[in-house]
Amino acid sequence: MAIPTYDELMSPVLKLLSDGVERSGEDITNTIANQLNLTEEERSRIYANNPKKVFKNRIAWARTYLKKAGLIESPQRATSKITSEGMKVAKSKLDKLNLKFLEQYESFKEFRHIDNSNLVENRSEKIETVQTPDEILDFVQNSYKKIYKVNYYQNSRALVL
């Protein structure tokens, strides 16, 4: 089984917290990993250029997005608890909780807002991604390494010839 993306994990996180219990991030991560029957390899997989565990990181981003939308709160460091608004959403049995759904909350829109005033071109379309910022950074770093290796190899060959 592939590790679910952070947006696919938002519903399980909200559903788990719908019992009203304040839970630690570790408890949320382990409980959902068990519910999804993730293997030990899937639970411990890390990013290529960073020591963070993929699944744990995706759960953390799912929690962050839910918190920014006001569906969960963090009463103490590294803990989460459902809010009354989160309880309403959990009870509505929404098919899929995603970024588009979260955009209805002003606090989430403010969190996602990017000041485009300094950009040369102001685009009207939004780029939606299912990758976390850490995954995007990992991809960029890998791409840079590949490009650097190719350029280094080509430059080395030119010097030898």
Identify what each model region corresponds to.
Residues 1-9:
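Intrinsically disordered, low-complexity serine/threonine- and proline-rich regulatory segments
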Residues 88-161:
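Mixed-charge (Asp/Glu-Lys/Arg
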Residues 17-27:
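Short capping segments at the starts of secondary-structure elements
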